Amino acid sequence: MKSFKLLSRKFKALGNERRLRIIEELLKYKRLSVGEISDKINLSFRSTSRHLKILDNANFIDCEHVGINMYYFISSEAPKEFLDLIKKFN
């Protein structure tokens, strides 16, 4: 049952165009701050943060603090098949 919940979370995370664009940008640039992501996908800082939290909860991305900034990158736990599928539609 637990694995179905995680799978459901992953599909929900990918079921939004803006979150797919965030993943696409992180695949392209490797590591970005919330502000950089927000500028690249033309979305408010607050909305971008909300989408990043959903992607983080689904284990697609990780983050690290550097000074006062938070940088996001693709998680090593992100399923390769999902990432390959996203790259295909670039």
Predicted regions mapped to residue ranges:
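Conserved segment of winged-helix/HTH DNA-binding domains
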Residues: 3, 11, 28, 71-90
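Key DNA-contact positions within bacterial/archaeal DNA-binding proteins
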Residues: 46
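Short capping segments at the starts of secondary-structure elements
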Residues: 17, 29-33
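Beta-hairpin "wing" of winged helix-turn-helix
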Residues: 56-66, 73
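Pre-recognition alpha-helix immediately N-terminal to the DNA-recognition helix
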Residues: 20-24
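Short, hydrophobic-biased segments on the C-terminal half of alpha helices
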Residues: 52-53
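A short acidic, leucine-rich amphipathic alpha-helix
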Residues: 37-38
